[in-house]
Amino acid sequence: MSNKKRSASSSRWLQEHFSDKYVIQAQKKGLRSRAWFKLDEIQQSDKLFKQGMTVVDLGAAPGGWSQYAVTQIGSKGRVIACDLLPMDPIVGVDFLQGDFRDELVLKALLERVGDKKVQVVMCDMAPNMSGTPAVDIPKSMYLVELALDMCRDVLAPGGSFLVKVFQGDGFDEYLREIRSLFTKVKIRKPDASRARSREVYIVATGRKL
């Protein structure tokens, strides 16, 4: 891609981003990101969070989902968050900075979870996008497979899994895998998710024994 085309594409993205009503609302409300609104819509329909829950947030930065989750689980709840990028502190959130794909980071994350199972695992991870689906989709599927592995390790029976997935090769197989592990599975496209984006959110509840 030429610099001219890249510049035009970047300019369009910036214009779209800063005119987005959810970006504007997030700024007015002092929220970390527009992702807050996606999770709020999902919570209204699927009721994932309750007071006192422990939640794992993968791909947490800049903190939109963690920020929302703590409002739902209260002072007795706990969010354990992880991201490759730094994240400013949030009261009620135990944040670990590191690459989730790294064995040492995963070990540290599991140590923070401890022996008790968690009630929700949520994953908003995405790779650095090249704009080429044949490259981006496999990278994304690898990340969400790791997140599902995390569910197998730490999610309590009856627990819930929320994951952002980009539709493409491997999506149907991944969905079948999730359905084998949970009693109820829904696909959501929140209003705050841009229409042209391939992203959808799989909401899986009732982790099977």
UniProtKB/Swiss-Prot annotation:
Its EC number is 2.1.1.166. Specifically methylates the uridine in position 2552 of 23S rRNA at the 2'-O position of the ribose in the fully assembled 50S ribosomal subunit. S-adenosyl-L-methionine binds at G63, W65, D83, D99, D124. Its main location: cytoplasm. Keywords: Cytoplasm, Methyltransferase, rRNA processing, S-adenosyl-L-methionine, Transferase. GO terms for cellular component: cytoplasm. It holds the Pfam family FtsJ. It catalyses: uridine(2552) in 23S rRNA + S-adenosyl-L-methionine = 2'-O-methyluridine(2552) in 23S rRNA + S-adenosyl-L-homocysteine + H(+). This is Ribosomal RNA large subunit methyltransferase E. The active site is at K164. Belongs to the class I-like SAM-binding methyltransferase superfamily. RNA methyltransferase RlmE family. It is an enzyme of class 2 (transferase). GO terms for biological process: RNA methylation. GO terms for molecular function: rRNA (uridine-2'-O-)-methyltransferase activity. It is found in: Cytoplasm.
